[in-house]
């Protein structure tokens, strides 16, 4: 990055981090596990398998996304598409009463959420000088918590 930091870009960075925290804390850590076990009478293992399956897919694919991000410099479009898919899949979980459909939607939502982070994190050097990367990253963390 050269010149003055773009305040709008920094604010966008921080707000995205805020949304990440909401998704991670509420959907992944708290509510979806309860949705599976309490609302639908599923076993804990189903939640664990869905989470593990989505993370396995992430582990296989995000190195490729990282290469694409680094070599092409295209970050905004993949970030936007993955975020939109994650939001839609998350919203649809609340619209279904079928456990297996909800588990499938959760896998999609979490996969896209985790994959989007590759593009989101790679944008930080574009909005921050090397000397203030930590501070700007901290804005996002502090807003999220």
Model-predicted regions and their roles:
Residues 44-45, 128-141:
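Loop-to-transmembrane helix entry/capping segments in MFS-fold secondary transporters
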Residues 115-129:
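Intracellular juxtamembrane helix-capping segments at the cytosolic ends
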Residues 69-84:
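Cytoplasmic membrane-interface "Motif A"-like loop-to-helix N-cap segments
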Residues 59, 80-98:
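C-terminal ends and interior cores of transmembrane alpha-helices
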Residues 16, 49-50, 137-144:
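Hydrophobic alpha-helical segments of secondary membrane carriers
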Residues 2-55, 99:
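Helix-loop boundary and gating motifs at the non-cytosolic
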Residues 89-90, 97-119:
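Hydrophobic core of transmembrane alpha-helices in multi-pass small-molecule transporters
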Residues 55-63:
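Residue-level signature of mid-helix packing/kink "hotspots" within the transmembrane helices
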């Amino acid at each position: 990055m050269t010149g003055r930091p773009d305040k709008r870009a920094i604010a966008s960075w921080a707000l995205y981090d805020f949304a990440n925290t909401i998704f991670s804390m509420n959907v992944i850590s708290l509510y979806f596990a309860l949705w599976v076990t309490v609302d639908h009478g599923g076993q804990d293992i189903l939640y664990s398998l869905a989470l593990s399956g989505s993370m396995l897919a992430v582990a296989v694919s995000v190195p490729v996304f990282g290469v694409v991000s680094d070599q092409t410099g295209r970050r905004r479009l993949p970030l936007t598409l993955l975020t939109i898919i994650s939001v839609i899949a998350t919203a649809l979980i609340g619209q279904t009463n079928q456990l297996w459909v909800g588990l499938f939607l959760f896998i999609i939502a979490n996969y896209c959420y985790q994959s989007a982070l590759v593009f989101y994190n790679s944008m930080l050097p574009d909005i921050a000088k090397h000397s203030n990367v930590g501070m700007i990253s901290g804005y996002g963390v502090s807003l999220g918590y």
